[in-house]
């Protein structure tokens, strides 16, 4: 007999008591007020960041605006000329640095100057912010300047570390290392760490500092998945055309003092959140609940994710993980409620997805076993929340658990793909990682979704790429959308996964009107799909000929196009063992020599097709073709003479007929 459902008012009261519900913004403000009741008014004023440092007068503003425009144009004849210009800006900016970095207009100039200045100038700018780093980190525009400054400073710390004899006579006065300047700045920020964690702008600065101190990659500030800036900031940075220099997207060596500072920062934050508790048993449930609220706060959550990622460098107990989650083998009602919130909230699911990737395996296995194992399909159906957690589990759990998830999810795959195409990629990767586990079932589900056998109008280009609703063929010069790019990448993954999808895609292309297929070749995204099917050894010769019949007609125009030229480069190999098609394309390009050579893309195609050799030494070009064919098809046999048996039979028949003739003449 199954378990009876518990009913009654007391049970409902207990459920409400255990339920996790984050505080509203007003409640958070109340919590912050409670935390500050022990400070007097003077101390409260000291903790408020100073963010106004005056404004530039009209003439100064006009000069710096013009300087910013000049740097953006970057029309200098020599690097020395550019450096002299940057030096003149720095001289003019002395004493006005704080006004410049807190202005929307001139903060962009300061970022450009920091990216272009030398080490001595960088240190001067760094020192000009002493005493106000906290205020600047909380400022909408100055915080971006600080991030650029800190990345360049990290690069300089490494250079000084690897070159102890770094020139210290560059300027008069005592020589100060970048390491010491950085440590001085960190001491200035330490009293404000908890405030920075939950601040709209300062939280990004804090995340960057943790990355630097832990020797993690300092990401590009304009990439979509960058941890350095917010989504709005990355878009704005692209629009104002500030390009990162070579110091970004790298890992830097750091001195031992940085590891000590990282430990000190994380320990300080932990004590701040636990009210200085000596052991875990001294931490109250209300304290744990408050910290869990921080974990699902859209500003503080990324910082906590990063702390959980790096705390293992020096803390074997993983204190922050244990502050968020329990470690006991039994279920906990409050933790269960918290997990349910994480699995159904966009911020919470992103938090759980990321910490799963950096936590100890035994901790992840515990969460999976207690709270997710029995409802994995239901979680996968939560396309904006739970599905991301399931993907993380597929990537990080042991083989046995991954196979259990695949057993549950694969039969539902065609339905799950309706709302989350990326989930298909996760399933394919997990199946491959487990030695092709359930591979045939995965393929069957994918075909059922994108190329159903019973459908008369089946076309994977339509079902997967949604061609009819896309920007293909638009005359308004619409940019390809992010959704089109995502779908194209997924189809390319399917093509690589199994030959069935390669052949299905080619069949779908051949089913299109020729004009439509040619349009795909000129599209910024869909051209990659056309390029991806041109795999010489995987496509049978009949389908190769059918594709070449269409593409060869457009060879000259394709060669002169930014996207089509890549397809033409692939056709050089795709025409192997199809000499007639190769010569037809080469002849068409040579007949339009002027047009091809006048195009930057056409010149590259001309070079890759070895057409200078074709024009000057045709036989050498044909010899090159034969060598290429042998490289691509090393096991293919050239035309062989008839076997000896047949030749003997032929000779015998000739001798027999001759004997008959002799007999006849007798």
UniProtKB/Swiss-Prot annotation:
Pfam families hit by this protein: PUF_NOP9
Cellular compartments annotated: Nucleus, Nucleolus
Organism encoding this protein: Saccharomyces cerevisiae (strain RM11-1a) (Baker's yeast)
Biased composition (Basic residues): 1-14
Keyword Nucleotide-binding in annotation: no
Any GO CC annotation of this UniProt entry: nucleolus
GO molecular function, one term: RNA binding
Record's keyword annotation contains Aminoacyl-tRNA synthetase: no
Keywords, in A-Z order: Nucleus, Repeat, Ribosome biogenesis, rRNA processing
Similarity-based family: Belongs to the NOP9 family.
GO biological process, one term: endonucleolytic cleavage to generate mature 5'-end of SSU-rRNA from (SSU-rRNA, 5.8S rRNA, LSU-rRNA)
Function description: RNA-binding nucleolar protein required for pre-rRNA processing. Component of the 90S pre-ribosome involved in production of 18S rRNA and assembly of small ribosomal subunit. Component of the pre-40S ribosome required for release from the nucleolus.
PANTHER family according to UniProt: NUCLEOLAR PROTEIN 9
Protein name: Nucleolar protein 9
Region: Disordered, residue numbers: 1-40, 635-666
Repeat region (Pumilio), residues: 92-127, 128-163, 188-223, 286-326, 334-369, 370-407, 511-548, 549-587
UniProt biased composition (Basic and acidic residues): 642-653
Source taxon at top rank: Eukaryota
Assembly and oligomerization: Component of the 90S pre-ribosome. Component of the pre-40S ribosome.
